[in-house]
Amino acid sequence: MLNFIASINELFWGAILILLLVGTGIFYTLKLKFVQVRKFKKGVSQLTGDFDINGKDADHNGMSSFQALATAIAAQVGTGNLAGAATAIVSGGPGAIFWMWVSAFFGMATIYAEAILSQLFKRKVEGEVTGGPAYYIEELFNKSFLSKILAIFFALSCILALGFMGNGVQANSIGEAMKNAFNISPYITGAVVALLGGFVFFGGVKRIASFTEKVVPLMAGLYILICLIIIVINYSNVIKAFEAIFVNAFSMKSILGGFLGMGVKKAIRYGVARGLFSNEAGMGSTPHAHAIAKVKNPVEQGNVALITVFIDTFIVLTLTALVILTSNIGDGTLTGITLTQKAFEAALGYSGTIFIAVALFFFAFSTIIGWYFFGEANIKYLFGKKAINAYRILVMLAIFIGATQKVELVWELADLFNGLMVIPNLIALIVLYKLVVSTSNEYDKLHNL
């Protein structure tokens, strides 16, 4: 089973998806005149514009821009930053980190476009504001039958990729971390995480927004601080770590007969795959949060959205990678969260393992909340609000099952379903690009940007 899924992913995550993802990012970068550079400062200035620690702004009409940002980051900053960075390094070498940066830079333009479209096409479903790629995919080709099929395909893929398999990955990493740090059975961990998740799920959008708004800034800030401390401790290896990243990304051993050899192919495959799983640009996941932000203009949420990719990949994921690469503990036998824990343990002792276990619990659990929410938007699209309670129970079951499965199989399945989401979303982004560009340009003229 594992080998079969891995073979499909090798084909799926080969040149086609890589070209689609990076190509779309390059396309929007050029069309929007390097929007990720031009509007970076603007996006940062909007980050805390309407912060509400009590989550009072979240209701059936949506949530505040900051809460949408926090929900998006909650989904992005998870095992993709901790276990995913380690998996990328082991599977694709240090060079995979470089390709994460490349995909993230162009992904900032992609997610800017996703946020604008999700805002433009959000709607009320049975009295509640909702939105996401399925809603703008449906607008393709004059709302033809084909566009409806693509929208349904995306919605189903999203529910499977995030609500079920994706959350299984998060639970799997939590279970492995808790077993390594505290020798707690994955069955116990799975049950606890499922019940805690259910508590938030059944609280609706207000409880979700309140949770992410409070937890995300605290957990990300503390994690960044600890990473910086470890990198300072390992300062003598920092230059070597960057050398390994850049040299491995373009290793001469990779050139074979005019084609990319296995070295660079693996670095790109795992770098882009893990990069997507981490920052989610182009996947079509975070637009569900950005869609329901209460903003005056769709572009305002686009400005905020591109900052989320920067925080996720260029800050959190990069710091994780540097901790691993400067620790000198990788021998090829450690994978996933175990490698990350050992890197922290090398600098901080056993307390490093404890810290990663606790950090991963909060990172992954917040991602579970975010991904549940994204899946719920597609449940509403396909079946209406009547199916939400059944979906909540099934996600809780997926969390419990995911916590007890082998990490390789769960990761490979997540890659597969993530890829299935990408295709219809990128088709919509390309077809609707004129709308994105015109909306962005109008805003820029109005604000002299």
Language model features: what each stretch is:
Residues 1-79, 90-95, 107, 400, ...:
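N-terminal alpha-helical transmembrane segments of multi-pass membrane transport
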Residues 20-27, 32-44, 154, 171-178, ...:
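Membrane-interface loop-to-helix entry segments
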Residues 24, 28-29, 103-127, 138-172, ...:
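Helix-loop-helix module between adjacent transmembrane segments
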Residues 31-36, 80-85, 162-174, 197-211, ...:
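Transmembrane helix-loop junctions in multi-pass membrane proteins
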Residues 34-63, 87-97, 109-145, 330-347, ...:
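Flexible loop linkers connecting adjacent transmembrane helices
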Residues 53-90, 126-134, 138-140, 156-159, ...:
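Alpha-helical membrane segments and immediately flanking helix-loop junctions
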Residues 106-114, 191-205, 216-236, 269, ...:
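Selective recognition of specific alpha-helical transmembrane segments in multi-pass small-molecule
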Residues 112-126, 228-244, 252, 256-259, ...:
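Extracellular/periplasmic helix-exit of transmembrane alpha-helices
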